[in-house]
């Protein structure tokens, strides 16, 4: 199965701590040139990305509580609010993994819903569940809680833990959330074949830093 227009699935990503303004400018220009769905950047780069992309259709995703998810809920709220003020149209927040593992379901829901309710209606909230740290049962629970909390997407990984997206995890997540939520696969997706497998498994968005190489290989 060949996925046409794979660029429209891609969040072109630059989250390295050493990322410079020049690299963000390059990221945004590539997003315009290749018509990627979004760029995904750290909060400090949202304002620059918003200025660079203001005349384009490219969405701007800011990470929140990244990469550990261990920030206090009100800090995540503030971070999300400021990101939107600076031009973000999407928020990729990290779930509180410790609370999830401790089966503190209501606290996990509150952590997510607080961010969902802090940002204006129309802002897309993706919840990163960090699949590599979870059992299959915990992956299912995380997706169920994200859905109950009003999130719009569940996302596999930060790309900063022990491993990234797998086809098996995407299938589990898609089966759990159904058509109500999107599924974003991210972490370790470096080639066209892997990206296509993730989409076939149910991913509706792909997070990648090798986006240009992926798209170029599709056109070859």
From Swiss-Prot:
Catalyzed reaction equations: 2-deoxy-D-ribose 5-phosphate = D-glyceraldehyde 3-phosphate + acetaldehyde
Enzyme Commission code: 4.1.2.4
GO BP field: 2-deoxyribose 1-phosphate catabolic process; carbohydrate catabolic process; deoxyribonucleotide catabolic process
Any one cellular-component term (Gene Ontology): cytoplasm
Cellular compartments annotated: Cytoplasm
Root EC class: lyase
Pathway: Carbohydrate degradation; 2-deoxy-D-ribose 1-phosphate degradation; D-glyceraldehyde 3-phosphate and acetaldehyde from 2-deoxy-alpha-D-ribose 1-phosphate: step 2/2
Presence of the UniProt keyword Iron-sulfur in the record: no
Entry keyword set: Cytoplasm, Lyase, Schiff base
Active site feature: 92, 155, 184
Stored InterPro entries: Aldolase_TIM, DeoC, DeoC/FbaB/LacD_aldolase, DeoC_typeI
An example molecular function term from Gene Ontology annotations: deoxyribose-phosphate aldolase activity
Pfam families according to UniProt: DeoC
Chief subcellular location: cytoplasm
Domain of life: Bacteria
Described function: Catalyzes a reversible aldol reaction between acetaldehyde and D-glyceraldehyde 3-phosphate to generate 2-deoxy-D-ribose 5-phosphate.
Family assignment from sequence similarity: Belongs to the DeoC/FbaB aldolase family. DeoC type 1 subfamily.
Protein name (record): Deoxyribose-phosphate aldolase
Organism of origin: Natranaerobius thermophilus (strain ATCC BAA-1301 / DSM 18059 / JW/NM-WN-LF)
Species classification: Bacteria, Bacillati, Bacillota, Clostridia, Natranaerobiales
GN (gene name): deoC
